[in-house]
């Protein structure tokens, strides 16, 4: 395809994005990463890279415990714990767990709610029953949401597997053998300051439980050394609240002999504000005080959602204006670009009826200012695509498409492909004015065919650019 290249050929990039905990629907921040991450994957592939799209599923640790506690409380119609999860979806999932268990001959609510004689409810049988049934339900819901959003992950990686397979222990032992692990205050520490971190990190707490970074250490090693598609670049896409995480992760990269910012790249995305009627939208039908992917899709659909989230540099916060993005106006950027594509398809249909064939084109006749503007815009596409890949910047594709659509709409209004007779007043004009009008409105066959070829080139680039953003290119609107 025009603009595609192989300058990243021979590189395998692991692109991990969204990776929301299986404790609720995907919120608007995760939705932004879904749009940006999948678009970035498509752009990197168009630059010749092999890309592994990966979702890291945090099914180990405290968040899952809080999720299970919340479900048990909801099932008993009790108040959800202060640090628990709230929203109608918690009641829904609790009810589904009870029904599923019942179908399997288990009365979930009758199982013991305490773990020991001291009355510690801990990892009780009942909580474990809710956890083991609810997490796969949430996982399936997340997978369905991603599929509807046109994001296909190659790997769904479960954090738990790193512990079950012994990879966490092996990774820590490897660091220990090279002198990067020490014991202090009953805990096990990673000497990350040796590799530029601002402080050393606990990896096994004094109570014997692994700290969050223990899984991250093993996971990075897994990405680099796995049998199937090991990567030479591991790209992590994280939310704004993870900024403090960069130093420790780069230390992990360096400790294993890799080059920070080369073998590991961390991209930090900023906030998304959803606006309607000039006010911030903070409520969801299902999830309480957060806007979810389903809320956004219901309001404006997949095309407008993906385009609007990918068109702003993820280093900046973005306002999603639901009124604007639902409108059929030139102010709506996704409509403006898609309309250029639909217009070009309509030109094709009219040209076919008029018997104009590209084979008759004389491209030297693309000599008007409007022709020149479109040709110049088309010529920029390969460079834009390469820069978007190198800078991990999908928004460059969106901005380019808007510029190309602008040049095309102007061209469409100035030049005709299918000849049209001059009106009586127009035909009475004299000299250069009449000649210019005649060239614009009533071109001879070689010029009309050349314009048709230019029209089709625009159509091809817009369709290709929209595909990189995961957005459809309608042929009628």
Q: PLM features: residue spans?
A:
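Short, structured interface segments
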Residues: 1-4
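Non-catalytic interaction-recognition regions
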Residues: 7-477
């Amino acid at each position: 395809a025009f603009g595609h290249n192989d300058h990243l050929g021979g590189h395998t990039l692991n692109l991990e994005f969204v990776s929301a905990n299986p404790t609720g629907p995907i919120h608007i921040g995760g939705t932004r990463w879904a749009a940006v991450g999948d678009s970035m994957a498509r752009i990197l592939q168009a630059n010749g890279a092999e890309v592994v799209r990966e979702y890291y599923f945090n099914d180990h640790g405290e968040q899952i415990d809080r999720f299970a506690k919340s479900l048990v409380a909801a099932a008993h119609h009790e108040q959800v714990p202060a640090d628990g999860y709230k929203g109608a979806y918690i009641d829904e999932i609790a009810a589904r767990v009870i029904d599923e268990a019942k179908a399997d001959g288990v009365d979930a609510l009758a199982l013991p709610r305490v773990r020991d004689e001291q009355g510690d409810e801990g990892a009780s049988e009942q909580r474990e029953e809710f956890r083991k049934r609810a997490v796969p339900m949430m996982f399936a819901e997340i997978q369905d949401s991603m599929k509807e959003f046109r994001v296909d992950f190659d790997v769904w990686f479960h954090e738990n597997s790193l512990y079950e397979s012994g990879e966490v222990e092996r990774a820590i032992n490897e660091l220990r053998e090279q002198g990067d692990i020490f014991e202090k205050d009953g805990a096990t520490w990673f000497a990350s300051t040796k590799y530029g971190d601002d402080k050393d990190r606990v990896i096994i707490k004094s109570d014997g439980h692994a700290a969050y970074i223990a899984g991250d250490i093993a996971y990075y090693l897994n990405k680099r050394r796995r049998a199937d598609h090991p990567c030479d670049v591991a790209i992590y896409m994280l939310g704004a609240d993870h900024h403090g995480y960069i130093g420790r992760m780069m230390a992990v990269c360096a400790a294993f002999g890799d080059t920070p910012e080369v073998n590991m790249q961390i991209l930090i995305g900023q906030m998304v504000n959803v606006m309607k009627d000039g006010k911030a939208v903070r409520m969801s039908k299902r999830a309480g005080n957060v806007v979810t992917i389903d809320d956004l899709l219901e309001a404006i659909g997949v095309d407008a959602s993906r385009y609007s989230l990918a068109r702003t540099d993820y280093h900046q916060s973005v306002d999603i204006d639901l009124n604007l993005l639902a409108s059929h106006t030139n102010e709506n950027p996704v409509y403006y670009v898609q309309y250029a594509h639909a217009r070009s398809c309509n030109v094709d249909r009219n040209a076919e009826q008029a018997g104009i064939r590209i084979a008759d084109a004389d491209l030297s006749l693309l000599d008007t200012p409007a022709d020149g503007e479109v040709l110049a815009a088309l010529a920029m596409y390969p460079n834009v695509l390469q820069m978007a890949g190198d800078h991990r910047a999908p928004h460059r594709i969106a901005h380019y498409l808007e510029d190309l659509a602008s040049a095309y709409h102007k061209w469409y209004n100035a030049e005709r492909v299918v000849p049209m007779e001059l009106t009586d007043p127009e035909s009475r004009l004299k000299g250069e004015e009449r000649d210019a009008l005649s060239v614009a409105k009533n071109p001879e066959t070689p010029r009309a065919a050349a314009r048709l070829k230019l029209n089709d080139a625009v159509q091809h680039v817009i369709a290709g650019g929209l595909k990189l953003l995961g957005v459809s290119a309608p042929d009628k609107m």
